[in-house]
Amino acid sequence: MPEALQELAAHVRMRQPDAILGHRVEFGELTLDVVPNRIVGLVEFLRSDASCRFSSLVDITAIDHPERPARFDVVYHFLSMYQNQRIRLKMQVREDETVASIHSVHPSANWFEREVFDMFGILFTGHPDLRRILTDYGFRGHPMRKDFPTTGYTEVRYDEVQKRVVYEPVKLVQEYRQFDFLSPWEGADYILPGDDKART
């Protein structure tokens, strides 16, 4: 399988040299680093080229790296049922940079791009209806950004007296504390009181 993915990477780089910055094969999937302003043409090529035929858009997401000048990675996942292969396209964009929508090539990108906009605040130019999809219309901020406060900005609750949903600023009964526990996946090297199973 890695040989087939390396051949695919070589084919794409040969046919779309201006769109690809680099590639790697990890965990049985090919990742292409893409020039942001070439994304639409590359996606069209991956869909229509006979050696590719990546006709299924699986997901679009983003990764926040606040310490980098190009803060976000926008990541596209595609599937070729004809070639039985997956491909990941990854591009770095600045916070003030827009990304071209691939809605014209994959109409299902509509929902994924709206989600990325809602969660990260990344704007997609050429999108037919770029508005929030998971949070309320008046929601402040973008909750998947690493600088978004854990408590949020607004508390939403049903008020029994007013018989409606009310929005209020978050009021913490005690100062917010950040706990630094051991990872639950690494497991503890001590026995908790009352944990009889650990002693047997």
Swiss-Prot record:
- Membrane topology term: Peripheral membrane protein
Query: According to its UniProt record, what is one Pfam family this protein matches?
Result: Complex1_30kDa
The chemistry this enzyme catalyses reads:
a quinone + NADH + 5 H(+)(in) = a quinol + NAD(+) + 4 H(+)(out)
State its location(s): Cell inner membrane
InterPro entries, per database record: NADH_DH_suC, NADH_quin_OxRdtase_su_C/D-like, NADH_UbQ_OxRdtase_30kDa_su, NADH_UbQ_OxRdtase_CS
Is Ion transport tagged as a keyword? no
Q: What class of enzyme is it?
A: translocase
The EC designation for this entry is 7.1.1.-
Q: Does the keyword Cell membrane apply?
A: yes
Main location class: membrane
Entry keywords, A to Z:
Cell inner membrane, Cell membrane, Membrane, NAD, Quinone, Translocase, Transport, Ubiquinone
This entry's Gene Ontology molecular function terms read: NADH dehydrogenase (ubiquinone) activity; NADH:ubiquinone reductase (non-electrogenic) activity; quinone binding
One GO cellular component this record assigns the protein to is: plasma membrane
Assembly and oligomerization: NDH-1 is composed of 14 different subunits. Subunits NuoB, C, D, E, F, and G constitute the peripheral sector of the complex.
State its role: NDH-1 shuttles electrons from NADH, via FMN and iron-sulfur (Fe-S) centers, to quinones in the respiratory chain. The immediate electron acceptor for the enzyme in this species is believed to be ubiquinone. Couples the redox reaction to proton translocation (for every two electrons transferred, four hydrogen ions are translocated across the cytoplasmic membrane), and thus conserves the redox energy in a proton gradient.
Q: Which HAMAP family match?
A: NDH1_NuoC (MF_01357)
Question: Into which family does the record put it?
Answer: Belongs to the complex I 30 kDa subunit family.
Know the name of this protein?
NADH-quinone oxidoreductase subunit C
Q: Name its species.
A: Cereibacter sphaeroides (strain ATCC 17023 / DSM 158 / JCM 6121 / CCUG 31486 / LMG 2827 / NBRC 12203 / NCIMB 8253 / ATH 2.4.1.)
Question: In the UniProt record, what gene is named as encoding this protein?
Answer: nuoC
